[in-house]
A protein has these predicted regions:
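C-terminal scaffold of the Radical SAM
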Residues: 1-203, 261-262
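Residues at alpha-helix caps and immediate loop-helix transition turns in enzyme cores, especially N-
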Residues: 27-28, 205-208, 242
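Intrinsically disordered or highly flexible coil/loop and linker segments, enriched in small
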Residues: 162, 188-189, 222, 252-255
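Short amphipathic alpha-helical interaction segments
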Residues: 202-217
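A short, conserved structural fragment
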Residues: 217-227
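Minor-groove-contacting beta-hairpin "wing" of winged helix-turn-helix DNA-binding domains
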Residues: 228-232
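Short, amphipathic alpha-helical interaction segments positioned at domain boundaries
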Residues: 236-262
Length: 262
């Protein structure tokens, strides 16, 4: 890196989006080659979320020009291969990092954490949302600010908090958050750790979920034994799908999901 960058920043990240109109695995490979030449410390490769009902500019996009799920999965697989060859470590959930980046170090040391903003080396920190649409998290509560800029300024000018909705996690929410966090950060989960922390029998508590996971075992995405759940290398690219099994709210809000997995 250039000296000013090295002095001011600990890590230089880059975000890429796949699933855009006319993208193919070949065109995205060329993009990756150009980005790799720059050599960012971290790379996030996100699936494009096409939500024209929510975002008006997206209504200009012809949906027939978007790549099919099969092509997007091909792009994702190719991305993982090329970045691995370039020396990046797969952190999980679309994230890659250099081996000496603090995220990769935290992953090796078992201290990696993920909140709703992404992967972090700081676990269980309170977050204060600043600006419109931002989300804050304090303890077991989440709150989101208003989405419209004019409304945001209007509420601020009144000396009020611009929060328009929030949620307080119940006991089941916290257990599920712990399960998802372990899987999404470490690609494995020890039944005993959840049982000690929450005083539950894991396989009894999550009996329906365990039945779904066994289908993923048959697909080669997971291994399950008496001690816990282990995500295979092939399953790591689809860790979001695996964690979705434990999301009790997913079916309730299936029509409002923010982006397709593939």
């Amino acid at each position: 890196p250039q000296p000013p960058t090295a002095d001011a920043l600990r890590s230089l990240p880059t975000d890429l989006i796949y699933g855009l109109p006319f993208q193919t695995s070949d065109s995205f490979a060329r993009t990756l080659d150009r980005v790799n030449a720059v050599g960012p410390d971290r790379m996030s490769v996100f699936n494009y979320a096409h939500l024209p009902k929510t975002f008006k500019p997206q209504r200009r996009i012809d949906e027939s020009q978007l790549p099919e799920p099969k092509e997007k999965l091909k792009i994702l697989q190719m991305t993982a291969e090329k970045l691995s060859e370039a020396g990046y470590v797969y952190i999980g959930m679309d994230h890659f990092a250099r081996p000496d980046d603090e995220l990769a170090v935290a992953q090796r040391e078992g201290t990696l954490y993920r909140n709703f903003q992404g992967y972090s080396t700081h676990s269980n920190c309170d977050l204060v949302g600043m600006g419109m649409t931002s989300i804050g998290s304090v303890g077991n509560c989440y709150a989101q600010n208003v989405r419209e800029l004019d409304t945001y300024y209007e509420v601020i000018d009144k000396g009020q908090l611009p929060v328009f909705r929030g949620i307080k996690l119940n006991h089941d929410d916290e257990i599920r958050r712990g399960v998802i966090t372990q899987l999404i950060c470490h690609f494995e989960l020890a039944f005993a750790s959840i049982e000690r922390q929450w005083n539950v029998d894991f396989r009894d508590y999550f009996e329906p979920e365990m039945a779904q996971l066994h289908n993923m075992v048959n697909d080669g995405l997971l291994e399950i034994n008496d001690q816990g759940i282990y995500v295979t290398p092939g399953g790591q690219l689809l860790i979001r799908n695996i964690c979705m099994v434990f999301d009790v709210y997913l079916k309730q809000h299936s029509g409002q999901r923010f982006s397709k997995v593939i």
